[in-house]
């Protein structure tokens, strides 16, 4: 992790020597506000402003498993003033799940850095009777297809992780796709869904 941060710091130092940015930089998040990718972008924005100067603005362009925002960035001028802050979904998963995406993930983007690496974790509301992974598996086996699992959308990494979990544990649940991670957390904390 230290090497990654040093590489980012070195890249930012070199970038500032090139008099960039010379206009506001739009950091497009292809998901709704409140999810993890949005929070990462909003955490990076003031740090980038302090390090390189200029104005950085987060613009959420959600929809279609993140492909709307990614497509907007792919169509933007290649001048370094429009950046995509995303998870792997729109660039790795969506091209394989959707019939067509409005970009070529390998050709239409210059990949700059991995800002964060975060595992998918299984969470339940604090009031849930399930206090361990073993509890969740036992419930799934005792009452197949009853537990609801909220994801940030069809084809998202958390959706695919849930499907893999059910496959590997020989269980099943009810997938409840949301339009982003923010709404998932709201309903999870409110008890509208059993897990995420």
What are these model-predicted stretches?
Residues 80-86, 148, 194-196:
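Paired acidic/hydrophobic, glycine-rich loop segments that form the ligand-binding mouth/hinge
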Residues 14-16:
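N-terminal signal peptide c-region/cleavage motif recognized by signal peptidases
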Residues 37-53, 159-167:
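Short, polar/charged alpha-helical segment
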Residues 67-70, 184-185:
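Short, hydrophobic alpha-helical packing/hinge segments within bilobed ligand-binding/sensory domains
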Residues 75-81, 96-183:
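Hinge/capping helix and adjacent helix->loop/strand transition within the periplasmic-binding protein
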